[in-house]
Amino acid sequence: MMKHICALLALFLFCSVRLLAKVYVLSIGIADYPDKKNDLRISDNDAKTIAKVFKATNEAFVSVMLNEQATKAALISRIRSVFANAQSDDAVVLYFSGHGSPGALVCYDGLLTYQSIYKEMKVCRANRKIIIVDACYSGKMRTNNQRSSYFDTQNVMLFLSSRTNELSQETRYKNSLFTIFLERGLRGGADKNKDRKISAREIFDFVHQGVITASGDKQHPVMWGKFNNEMTIIKW
């Protein structure tokens, strides 16, 4: 009898945890590169900020990689391990702040091509997949000639801080311009219909307008992918 009670209790606890574990977040920020000439000021703070936003919810499992932790091999390994836990009704969020290069993100020790990211995202079971990139030339992610058709057929949102030929602006504050508005939006500023949920369309509209205005029309965030505009990014 006691064994049955223990088994039922374990099942109940598992289900309870499962109901809360709806968002898997990997937040990456690289400000300190091996060549100091390439250092940024606040990219690691950007990653900490976005991680903190999601940690404030009861639904998120959050993993953070900063600076020398974010090598190419380690990043791919962490993507696999974090997102492997997601089930079909969950969401996964990959956030990156650092240097960008046409066709790739600049990890601590080299380039991680967008094609490699496509490959890892493709095997993830989550139906809601969000990739947010705060980096120069991040818009290249949606225009690369080798871009997989995967993003045309799967429920993946690409939210990029700038157009293909634009720089993503740092600020004198603790976060970049894009991430300042991203944080504000995720904390409720983008909740236009006041339902305590931030949708894909709401966060894009809020950040897009804020960044364009604050940058003097020099930086234009872009959104790409085939997904439901009402897809929930976060509940705040």
Placement of each model-derived feature along the sequence:
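Cysteine endopeptidase catalytic domains of the caspase/legumain-like
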Residues: 3, 17-236
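Sec-dependent N-terminal signal peptides
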Residues: 5-14
